[in-house]
């Protein structure tokens, strides 16, 4: 009987853990200045302010018109949906090489530094075509944060 109880507990933990991750998607900031609040309402105090349009964030929860987000550095809070959009960006978590084509054998165009905000145009397999200030090219998706 104890074994059956343990099996049920493990099953439910795995099942509910999977459900909680299903709501996690990446979003981006619509504006250059976005308030992050302690709670999911305009009456909640402002916790901090983001000042970077297109910054990717992970949505981890939702309540009515607010989304709970977490950033690359594990800062979290609530943002109104009017300030968010479908993610079109990512951040390099390590220095990366930008290539002309989606292969490591292609001509290297530039070195992308860790922390650089990247605008994602499209992805194929484990490569994404990105733009970053002066450069446009392909980058491997490993060590990139913000991709759905």
Model-flagged regions — what are they?
Residues 40-44:
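Second-shell loop/turn segments in exported
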Residues 6-16:
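Sec-dependent N-terminal signal peptides
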Residues 1-4:
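N-terminal secretory signal peptides that target proteins for export/translocation
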Residues 20-38, 48-53, 60-101, 105-134, ...:
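SH3-family beta-barrel domains
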């Amino acid at each position: 009987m104890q074994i059956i109880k343990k099996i049920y507990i493990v099953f439910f933990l795995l099942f509910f853990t999977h459900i909680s991750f299903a709501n996690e998607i990446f979003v981006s900031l619509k504006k250059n200045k976005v308030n992050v609040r302690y709670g999911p309402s305009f009456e909640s105090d402002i916790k901090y302010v983001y000042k970077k349009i297109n910054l990717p964030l992970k949505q981890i929860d939702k309540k009515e018109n607010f989304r709970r987000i977490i950033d690359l550095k594990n800062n979290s809070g609530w943002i109104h949906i009017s300030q968010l959009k479908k993610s079109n960006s990512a951040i390099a978590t390590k220095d990366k090489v930008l290539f002309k084509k989606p292969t490591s054998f292609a001509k290297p165009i530039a070195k992308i530094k860790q922390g650089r905000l990247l605008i994602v145009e499209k992805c194929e397999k484990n490569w994404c075509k990105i733009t970053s200030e002066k450069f446009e090219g392909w980058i491997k998706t490993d060590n990139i944060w913000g991709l759905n």
